[in-house]
Structures are given as structure tokens and as C-alpha cells.
Amino acid sequence: MATSPDKINMEYYIGNKKENFAPINVYDDGEFTYFKMKRSFKDMPVVFMQEVDGNFTEVPVDVNDVTNGNNILKVRKVSKKIRFTVGKKTINIINQNYGR
């Protein structure tokens, strides 16, 4: 079932967009979070999402749309703060519409 357009949240801040593994944009449908990646991205980030208690937990990433050529990563969760990590590099992503 498709999500109606008024349910899509695209209010995300993406820090350090210059990194190769930084998403171009981020959006969610209230249940899943989607990360549109650059065509040139090579390093798969480890994705951490902030829990209600403030701690970050690594979450599984669905890469099905990457292998299909769409370059979209999907996480089965929505969170206020997200971290992409590759090696010692980290990108912080903030859901500016979380809880509204």
C-alpha cells in the first residue's frame, strides 16, 4: 500500500554532505526511513538511530533498492537523530519534524 504524499516527512538536516557516504536526501513515511544515496557512493555506512533513552543503537539496513540501481537505503524505523558511520567518519542526520 502506498503512503499518501501528506504523510511523507522530508524535514531532515544532513551534516557534512561532502562525504561520499552522505545521503542526498532523507525522508520517512512514519514507519520507515529512506536515504537517497549519491550515485558515486561506495562505502556502506553503519546506521545508528537514537532510542527514547538517548542511546544510539545500530539498526539493520535494507539495501534492496541499492542493488536495483535506485541507491536508496531503507531502515524499518523513524528516529529523531541518526548517525552514519564509515571508519572514523560520522555524519549526523536530524529529523526536524520528529514528534510533531
Where are these regions (language model features)?
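Solvent-exposed beta-strand/loop surfaces of large extracellular or lumenal domains
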Residues: 49-69
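Beta-strand-rich binding/interaction modules
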Residues: 44-48
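Edge beta-strands of extracellular beta-sandwich domains
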Residues: 58-60, 88-100
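Short edge beta-strand/loop segments characteristic of extracellular beta-sandwich folds
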Residues: 31-38
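Short proline/glycine-enriched turn/loop motifs at strand-loop junctions of beta-rich domains
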Residues: 39-43
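Short, aromatic- and glycine-rich surface loops/edge beta-strands on solvent-exposed regions
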Residues: 79-90
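Pro/Ala/Gly-rich low-complexity, hydrophilic intrinsically disordered segments
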Residues: 1-18
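Beta-sandwich interaction modules
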Residues: 66-79
